[in-house]
From Swiss-Prot:
DNA binds at H91, R110, K151. A zinc finger (FPG-type) spans 236-270. GO terms for molecular function: 8-oxo-7,8-dihydroguanine DNA N-glycosylase activity; class I DNA-(apurinic or apyrimidinic site) endonuclease activity; damaged DNA binding; zinc ion binding. The keyword Zinc applies. It comes from the Bacteria. Monomer. PANTHER family: FORMAMIDOPYRIMIDINE-DNA GLYCOSYLASE. This is Formamidopyrimidine-DNA glycosylase. It comes from Actinobacillus pleuropneumoniae serotype 7 (strain AP76).
């Protein structure tokens, strides 16, 4: 699943081709994604793309005729190509075509993403309920400690909750907890202030590093330039069940926590009894 670094990578990849451009047409081949594609998108001819931004895992195109919210879902990706360069494939559901012949193509085999129109993205219900950005100054140890009080949920589920902090998906949650030395099943309310300081620090480090390296190379993620990301080459625990921990040599274990596979080192991440 594309996570925050993948969406940030997509934003940086497509922005040079779309910023300041005039929309010629938006071609919708599949109306039903996670939510129905907004009808308004097919009436945006002449709209100028004045800015592009990201909030959590939503890519936002700000235009003179409202904002377009794009979510990549479980397997979505964005590509840039020239108009008529390549016929649309089976899973190419939406094309945004600019007047100068550039195409933003949305591919999604599982059809679990979205393309929505809204007058103002900041006021859309999908955006207003989100927690702080993990790389922002709002995401601090003091904030995380305060939000964790009386929370009996496992710390892994806690940091993956978008109401608490956005964009810490399964891969990066596993990696961050390993680097912080915290067992994924530790109750959030048992976090100490010092542990929160460490956890916030490594979450920021892991995500920043992944963005620099282009996101995580998984079968469903391709960068807008067609190249894979490279962060998977340095994953410490995620997807490494049965392999030796790079720090201590103990065998990495996996367990389903909150309906997600969670990877951890039982020696480096001890669950207090």
């Amino acid at each position: 699943m594309p996570e925050l670094p993948e969406v940030e990578t997509s934003l940086r990849g497509v922005e040079p081709y779309l910023h300041g451009k005039i929309i010629k047409q938006i071609v919708v081949r599949t109306q039903k994604l996670r939510w129905a594609v907004s009808d308004e998108l097919q009436h945006m001819q002449g709209a100028k793309i004045v800015a592009l931004s990201r909030r959590a895992k939503y890519l936002i195109l700000h235009t003179t005729q409202g904002d377009i919210l794009i979510h990549l879902g479980m397997s979505g990706s964005l590509g840039i190509l020239q108009e008529n360069q390549q016929p649309a494939g089976k899973h190419d559901h939406v094309d945004l075509i600019t007047q100068d012949g550039m195409v933003l193509r949305y591919n999604d085999p599982r059809k679990f993403g979205c393309w929505l129109w809204t007058k103002n993205a900041e006021q859309h219900e999908l955006i207003t309920r989100l927690g702080p950005e993990p790389l922002s100054e709002s995401f601090t140890a003091a904030y995380l400690f305060a939000r964790s009080r009386n929370k009996t949920v496992a710390v892994k589920n806690f940091i993956m909750n978008n109401d608490i902090v956005v964009g810490v998906g399964n891969i990066y949650a596993c990696e961050s907890l390993f680097m912080a030395g915290l067992h994924p099943e530790l109750a959030a309310q048992n976090l100490t202030e010092k542990q929160c300081e460490r956890l916030v620090k490594v979450i920021k480090e892991v995500l920043a590093k992944a963005i620099i390296q282009g996101g995580t190379t998984l079968k469903d993620f391709i960068q807008p330039d067609g190249k894979p990301g490279y962060f998977a080459q340095v994953l410490q625990v995620y997807g490494r069940k049965g392999e030796a921990c790079n720090d201590c040599g103990t065998i990495i274990e996996a367990k389903v926590i909150g309906q997600r596979n969670s990877y951890f080192c039982p020696h480096c991440q001890i669950l207090p009894r």
